[in-house]
């Protein structure tokens, strides 16, 4: 048999079948760097509309984890897709550099007794070192950005502009000093932000404590009695015995019914609804003597169990009946509700008792417990209560309790003098900060939508923002307080600008080493220089000011507003939250137009990632084994609005999907062998009907893909691209065109039409995948024929796809019908192959028995129907002529019969045709192949 291989147009490409991503991706990174891709995008972006995704800064501490990878990849997909959509989409990565975790690391390494200036120096060095490590990992993920000039909250310019942002808020009268209970960590020795608090189970003692009545006559009258004939106690229940020494009041709900219970040796005051459960807990018998509403008990005095002072009853709406006794003991220094209730009843700051020091130890002067650590003092307080006859019950419970996110140790509320941003404080002009923020939320688009209600609820219910910290490594609050009056210097805003100018040159050290006389002159002796630092959430929360408006100036002309903030869902109480407050305080609007949140990573069983469970996935390991593009494809394929499942098995499935997409692109490239779009591209009207349909299908898909990118539905992009490769291309079009592509004349219309379609599809496909498979798209781009920009990212969505007019005979609906018929034929061919009735599809001859309308439709393809069905023969017949052994199909009005061909196989096209062997010069070829080799070539019209 003659070898006819040389007469075929076989696929050929240097594009590798094996991806080798771990080895090839670094070469692409070098290419992007060598051509200055990010800088070129900025250069061509001047006339484009701007899209600003402002980076929420990760903390400059430790290696990146899988959550970091998810976040940065999502951001990069958006930036790349916006670039392809014709936007100028700068991406300035940033880092959060100040704060306790870094200071804690330095103290752990170098000891706690370092001079403050040395601590700051080492913190700055440590943060810089951590940033370099994280930066390398983010770049390796393929994230395109201004890596040579990222923003860092510790950059001198950023530190200075943060002070200026604070000055703006001072100018508008949002900032004040106050004594309030704040989240306090003994290990940190500082207040904590709400976002630095996490909850964990804690075992705590619970005690029921009786406070003896001091105003017995008033108590009797409240219950409608003439007098009390025995001692009486009002009973509280608490899980914090250590707060009893600081008790200053008792709270009841005005509308709850309270009972005076005769418990034998004394009367007990309890919520009526809880009498039965309380008596059972006390192992006592008792009888309700009288009842009264809580409001009747207001201002009745009781005595502290072991100190010579009174505890009056105050009314409070937060008292509930879900546990305890229905009466709450109030220590205003150690509880927010307690504090506000006592203040409402006229208690001054000087009257508030605060015996617990910053390290958790009682002051030495506290009777009975001085010098004791509060957690260790709990049993001693219980013993004292038992000694004085006030302990009615003592148990232990496990409950959810607030802990420090860094030290994992329990926190307390502790009233300290701190600097606050007032939520309801009336500014010099306009609405309160709470009102501004709640209004701004209504102007913000949330993705997913439930984020709006979540953030609204947090803002509506949050207390004033405590912005001061008692640490070394942080941006200073550069205030001077008058020693006599405690008031801020009258030139505070002006002085803050002078400090900012110094910080811009020397960093935060400029404030800490500053002699007050340098700024205040002779006034210095009258003022105290404050050394508090700003909450790190103020650092990151003002990046819209000191980055978009300041160091990088990438905001819109209208001001430092980002189009999008994108972070994990925990940032509703973190960066989204603090940015909203600072934006509304300074500019009276949110610093973002859209908020997008993603969930957290879990394993395939829905469990959180944990080293102890052994279910963590390290991004660096995935990159080194599978490649960054596999990680990117996994991120894109997941609905990130909920929990994001990841495991080795899930990543392997992503790798399998990647292979299908890569193989499809390789098929396209290999069949563009010998194609030059400058000379070989056909106009739509000269293309075959099937090829026009394929280009039209790509156009429809591109519209859907562009919309999915606009709406951040990357999982839809993935599924549409993957399905297109598997179904419309792999399962239909590409199989059909192989015969025409390989066997017709190299420069025939039939082949050039096919190549034109493949070229258009490849041009579109490489762009569709570019935001997700960043490395692979760049690799594909280099192998596409024709002149083009250096990088796919310097292009925009492909505009060469042509729509198939609705009025053509073989329109979209026609090919949908043909696809259904082909699927039915394929199913029967599979059955026949399984039964070993036929070998390959080309060994089969199929007869389609169709009702008249369907037969007429299929007849439009003429002799080319067999090429669509990929059988050696395809015959049409009336449905009424179907023999008994014809097979029903899922297509209405269609039956099938497949038989094995009795004809010889063509040695070139492999079709079984009756004219094989009829040509003496080529005894093993069919007439069609002889025409393609020696004649003017076959003519195709449809497929």
Curated annotation (Swiss-Prot):
Binds 1 zinc ion per subunit. InterPro entries: aa-tRNA-synth_I_CS, aa-tRNA-synth_Ia, Anticodon_Ile_BEm, Ile-tRNA-ligase, Ile-tRNA-ligase_type1, Ile-tRNA_ligase, M/V/L/I-tRNA-synth_anticd-bd, Rossmann-like_a/b/a_fold. It is found in: Cytoplasm. A motif ('KMSKS' region) lies at residues 608-612. Its EC number is 6.1.1.5. GO terms for molecular function: aminoacyl-tRNA deacylase activity; ATP binding; isoleucine-tRNA ligase activity; tRNA binding; zinc ion binding. It is an enzyme of class 6 (ligase). One of its GO terms (cellular component) is cytosol. Gene3D superfamilies: 1.10.730.20, HUPs, Ile-tRNA synthetase CP2 domain-like. The keyword Transcription does not apply. Its main location: cytoplasm. Monomer. Belongs to the class-I aminoacyl-tRNA synthetase family. IleS type 1 subfamily. This is Isoleucine--tRNA ligase. The gene is ileS.
